Amino acid sequence: MNIHEYQAKALLREFGVPVSRGVPVLQASEAEAAAETLGGPVWVVKSQIHAGGRGKGKFKEASAGEKGGVRLARSIDEVKTFAGQMLGATLVTAQTGPAGKQVNRLYIEEGSDIDKEFYFSALVDRETSRISFVVSTEGGMNIEEVAHKTPEKIVTFSVDPATGVMSHHGRTVARALRLRGDLGKQAEKLVTQLYDAFIARDMAMLEINPLVVTKQGELRVLDAKISFDSNALYRHSDVVALRDESEEDAKEIEASRFDLSYVALDGQIGCMVNGAGLAMATMDIIKLYGMAPANFLDVGGGATKDKVAAAFKIITADPNVKGILINIFGGIMKCDVIADGVVAAVKQVGLNVPLVVRLEGTNVDAGKKIIRESGLNVLPADDLDDAAQKIVKAVKEVA
């Protein structure tokens, strides 16, 4: 689960992390009061969407002006003008895709006199089962680009969960960022604060880009992005309360209600599979034969008829889907349950695109019989390769 920048900063502030003062704004009429509260003389007006690259992004609407999603204002009138332009407009960034995202919230923040910019992040390293830190002197930039062009400028290290953060971790960060004296001590303290926040709130990723040194000689978090471990949300009602469903794909929200693992993608072939590994293999082979998957969807091993029907409805609700591939290898999941769910869903919502079904495993004969006797226009497949070729061919023929 992701949250907005202003929410992330409020959370970090609880752990003593140095963040700039700011005020969230939902309506343009609130901008003037927010700016007056902060005092100026410089303000930063920030679009709040769940995507990076806001500063370099562009709004679709001409009325929003030519500037990006993060704007520097030198007067209260400018703050008001920017708020009026940006709220309700659609911001397109490198991470939103061409559709962009509507800006429904702003964060008006006090300006900072910046001397240096750094990159700092913490994330769960699944290979080591530890929290890893990534730091770089190249702040304010795309860290993937830095890793590609100048990997020597990135320093990483992990923390043993048995000991937690120790003083040498802080010194490692200070040394990597070339911070000495009081700034080095601030860096050591910051590492402990961020680690404590990460653990206490069950975060999956914490990214600060940039972490800055002000001209007053202070470390300050200028931008913060936090993702939480969804499996741990039951322990954090306060974090769940921060969820902004308007920033999430409606199909993904619906899928979560049925405990389905669903991720919307940009392709044209909808997929329903049991097992994450098989789902990824299915997506790969669709790409191999020249088309792209419209989603990742794992119905899991214990799916019921209703759950399968819900999954099918979610796939067909995507207007980009031009064909559907169902690939089931029944172990715990029974093929006849899948078949019952698909038939029930098709009878409710109809079927206007080609459908290929590949069933193998537990109760496979019963499953094939249910589909065969349903009267549905379904293309059966013998194996995954056959299924992928058939759905790609069927979609291309319809197009």
UniProtKB/Swiss-Prot annotation:
Annotated cofactor note: Binds 1 Mg(2+) ion per subunit.
Keyword Cell membrane part of the UniProt annotation: no
Annotated ATP binding sites: 46, 53-55, 109, 112, 117
Domain of life: Bacteria
Pathway of action: Carbohydrate metabolism; tricarboxylic acid cycle; succinate from succinyl-CoA (ligase route): step 1/1
Reaction(s) catalysed (UniProt annotation): succinate + ATP + CoA = succinyl-CoA + ADP + phosphate; GTP + succinate + CoA = succinyl-CoA + GDP + phosphate
GO molecular function, one term: succinate-CoA ligase (GDP-forming) activity
Residues that, per the record, bind Mg(2+): 209, 223
Gene Ontology cellular-component terms listed: cytosol; succinate-CoA ligase complex
Co-factor(s): Mg(2+)
EC number, as in UniProt: 6.2.1.5
Record keywords, A-Z: ATP-binding, Ligase, Magnesium, Metal-binding, Nucleotide-binding, Tricarboxylic acid cycle
Listed Pfam families: ATP-grasp_2, Ligase_CoA
UniProt feature coiled coil, ranges: none
Family to which the UniProt record says this protein belongs: Belongs to the succinate/malate CoA ligase beta subunit family.
Physiological role: Succinyl-CoA synthetase functions in the citric acid cycle (TCA), coupling the hydrolysis of succinyl-CoA to the synthesis of either ATP or GTP and thus represents the only step of substrate-level phosphorylation in the TCA. The beta subunit provides nucleotide specificity of the enzyme and binds the substrate succinate, while the binding sites for coenzyme A and phosphate are found in the alpha subunit.
Protein name in the entry: Succinate--CoA ligase [ADP-forming] subunit beta
Species in which this protein is naturally found: Nitrobacter winogradskyi (strain ATCC 25391 / DSM 10237 / CIP 104748 / NCIMB 11846 / Nb-255)
